[in-house]
């Protein structure tokens, strides 16, 4: 358990006995600490830090971040409503969506901020709300991510209005008398800090041509190391050159821009873990592999199968005792050959064993780095497995239930049979 900061072995056994597994576990102290780091991002003229709630939309997580002073970026109208139900004021929510919600008018009139992500969205907003304020998302022409599947900037990404279409943006603005008060970009998750800084400079160059812009969002994508030895972005180091660029912009253009950032992974990734139980241990002979099978898998954690993402893993013996170590592959519970939690780095097509404590049926197994894009992005209900329970470790280490395990009745609630099959 040395490679994982939480939960402790004792907490794992408590979770297994009291709540069952699989269980997502979020650590309140880590969430609050990461929020404080984001809010301290270097800025000369004011900062709004928005939590990209798609990373983990749990009401408990949203409530913690809101109380810490974070605002919200929602990727759909449904997320915006979900944030409000968790207690986030609508004026602290920005909607940045690929798909315009059917109730856009309702959301805007409630106070939700709108961020147009295409010329069509900008035109539609102008038709519905002439003369109103909004921001626009721009694709600056480059991107960066921990893999091509998380790169959301550059010519191969559909996110945002292409930076060369500024004249069309201005034409739509004039036609509907819109106030473009905000400019937004986001280039990927796990971004190279140098590319991120270069992108910020490009965005400021575009801002110079938009005299109404008062706030500039640089998005998120701050690299977070989940595995031991992996680097994480130091926000103070990455942010200081950006703050200096904002100061230079103010000197040259007479505008002191309010800065926004939009972290998701940075805030939540290492504040979450997945607790599972070992249900079998099998092997494929002397020339094969030793497998640990667990009662979780791609139905709870899709990132390894999707990206070849790496997560720290630890076996927790059912009783405290000394054991040796062995090389294992960890397999999920789905009837799917790709449901393996130990792929080669960035290559889900290959396998890579892990040196783990000798595992026995009934042991606990903890997967770290599961606070972001795990509960929010699983192969939900595959093989008809129910959604896992979610827990919050309070400041004193006590686990609290924040989402019940899905029941079979809930899983089937929306299914209907036509009369012909009755």
Residue map of PLM features:
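Active-site-proximal loop/turn and secondary-structure-junction residues that shape catalytic pockets
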Residues: 55-57, 78, 99-101, 118-120, ...
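Acidic/histidine-enriched ion/cofactor-binding microenvironments in catalytic or ligand-binding pockets
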Residues: 127-128, 205, 211-213, 237-240, ...
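A charged N-terminal "starter" segment
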Residues: 1-132, 167, 171-179, 208, ...
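Active-site loop/helix belt of alpha/beta enzymes
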Residues: 140-282, 383-385
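Charged (often Lys/Glu-rich) extended helix/loop segments that serve as interaction or gating elements
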Residues: 254-422
């Amino acid at each position: 358990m040395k490679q994982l900061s939480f939960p402790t072995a004792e907490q794992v056994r408590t979770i297994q006995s009291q709540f069952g597994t699989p269980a997502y576990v979020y650590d309140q102290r880590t969430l609050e600490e990461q929020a404080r780091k984001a809010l301290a991002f270097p800025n000369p003229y004011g900062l709004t830090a928005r939590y990209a709630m798609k990373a983990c939309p749990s009401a408990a997580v949203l409530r913690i971040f809101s109380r810490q002073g974070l605002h919200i970026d929602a990727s759909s109208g449904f997320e915006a409503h979900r944030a409000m139900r968790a207690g986030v004021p609508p004026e602290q929510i920005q909607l940045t969506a690929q798909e315009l919600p059917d109730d856009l008018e309702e959301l805007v009139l409630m106070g939700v901020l709108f961020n147009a992500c295409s010329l069509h969205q900008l035109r539609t907003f102008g038709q519905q709300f002439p003369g109103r304020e909004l921001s626009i998302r721009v694709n600056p022409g480059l991107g960066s991510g921990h893999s091509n599947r998380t790169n959301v900037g550059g010519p191969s990404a559909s996110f945002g209005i292409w930076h060369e279409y500024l004249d069309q943006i201005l034409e739509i603005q004039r036609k509907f008398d819109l106030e473009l008060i905000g400019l937004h970009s986001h280039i990927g998750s796990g971004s190279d800090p140098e590319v991120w800084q270069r992108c910020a400079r490009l965005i400021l160059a575009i801002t110079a041509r938009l005299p109404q812009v008062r706030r500039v969002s640089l998005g998120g994508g701050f690299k977070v190391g989940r595995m031991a030895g992996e680097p994480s972005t130091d926000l103070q180091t990455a942010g200081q050159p950006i703050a200096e660029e904002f100061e230079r912009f103010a000197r040259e253009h007479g505008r002191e821009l309010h800065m926004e950032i939009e972290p998701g992974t940075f805030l939540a990734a290492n504040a979450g873990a997945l607790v599972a139980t070992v249900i079998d241990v099998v092997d494929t002979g002397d020339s094969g592999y030793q497998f640990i099978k667990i009662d979780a898998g791609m139905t709870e954690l899709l990132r390894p199968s999707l990206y070849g993402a790496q997560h720290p893993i630890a076996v927790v013996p059912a009783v405290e005792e000394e054991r040796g170590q062995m090389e294992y592959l960890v397999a999920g519970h789905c009837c799917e050959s790709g449901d393996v939690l130990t792929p080669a780095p960035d290559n889900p097509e290959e396998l890579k064993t892990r040196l783990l404590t000798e595992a026995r049926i009934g042991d606990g197994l903890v997967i770290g780095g599961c606070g972001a894009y795990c509960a929010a992005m699983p192969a939900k209900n595959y093989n008809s497995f129910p959604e896992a329970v979610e827990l919050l470790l309070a400041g004193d280490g006590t686990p609290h239930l924040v989402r019940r395990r899905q029941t079979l009745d809930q899983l089937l609630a929306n299914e209907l049979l036509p009369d012909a099959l009755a």
